[in-house]
């Protein structure tokens, strides 16, 4: 039988010995841990123990299971640990085991105290006499991972500013101000989409009896004028929509290759009538057309190339992939009016047939 307990009062050693005693056992081994009176020249008054009780009891039970798996002959196992303040020379932990032979009992108690120190979440604080501050004692036998004390010191690493990093290795070339502006624009667009969705969910309902359906109301209240209808096969009253991010880091794998896409768009948008007389003018004119620039063929070609470069840098700093691959949000599309067919009763149909019979003699 396993006897496991965390107690906040003095441990009765005699009672513990009686618990593990059994007529079939010829050996009983017991370990008693007490509070010593000094540590590194300082007078120890008492020890204070704290524990995560639920986890500690589970670990102690696992230790008992490991003991029985290793030494099946064990009859009784006892693990008592005291919490709170433990004065000098009083027992803080008692571990005992009984078995038919002494070898199993002695080895089991040794194994149990080692595992208790390394696995069970119990913390010890030493209280000293005089003006010495109390100290929490680190368990050097614990198998739990410890935080690395040797953190990386960035000040030791010297930055070699003489080396010029190639611009091809830099993915984002915008400065901090431009990055902040992009993030703010992204937040504004998402906020506008959410507001548009809220307007659709909580728009003015024509089902209200006190409001004329022919009158359009710009301002409405969602708490008093919205109509809640439970969706089929759902516990929610509002319609749940699946969010589809048409742009962003999650869609990187679905994005086409920009070089091939740029080539395709360039060739598809350029008309054969706009090709200049020379090959150089025609190719430069195609790039200018795609970039949205207007120039004359007789203009200086150096100035035209410079304008194209400035345009490319501008588009590169404002994320050009959104120009061609961003799909229009469904929120921007006008809402389609739902046409409902009128339902006629049997009486109305008879009246209608009777009137038609009179009109057609």
From Swiss-Prot:
A molecular-function term among this protein's GO annotations: molybdopterin synthase activity
CDD domains per the UniProt record, alphabetical: MoaE
GO terms classed as biological process: chromatin remodeling; Mo-molybdopterin cofactor biosynthetic process
Location(s) in or outside the cell: Cytoplasm
Entries under Pfam families matching the protein: MoaE
Record's keyword annotation contains Glycosyltransferase: no
Keyword Cytoplasm in annotation: yes
Positions of substrate binding: 101-102, 117, 124-126
TM regions (residue ranges): none
Pathway: Cofactor biosynthesis; molybdopterin biosynthesis
Entry superkingdom: Eukaryota
The EC number(s) this enzyme carries: 2.8.1.12
Keyword annotations: Cytoplasm, Molybdenum cofactor biosynthesis, Transferase
Catalytic activity: 2 [molybdopterin-synthase sulfur-carrier protein]-C-terminal-Gly-aminoethanethioate + cyclic pyranopterin phosphate + H2O = molybdopterin + 2 [molybdopterin-synthase sulfur-carrier protein]-C-terminal Gly-Gly + 2 H(+)
GO cellular component assignments: ATAC complex; cytosol; molybdopterin synthase complex; polytene chromosome
Miscellaneous notes: This protein is produced by a bicistronic gene which also produces the small subunit (Mocs2A).
Cited function: Catalytic subunit of the molybdopterin synthase complex, a complex that catalyzes the conversion of precursor Z into molybdopterin. Acts by mediating the incorporation of 2 sulfur atoms from thiocarboxylated Mocs2A into precursor Z to generate a dithiolene group.
Subunit structure: Heterotetramer; composed of 2 small (Mocs2A) and 2 large (Mocs2B) subunits.
UniProt family annotation: Belongs to the MoaE family. MOCS2B subfamily.
The protein's name: Molybdopterin synthase catalytic subunit
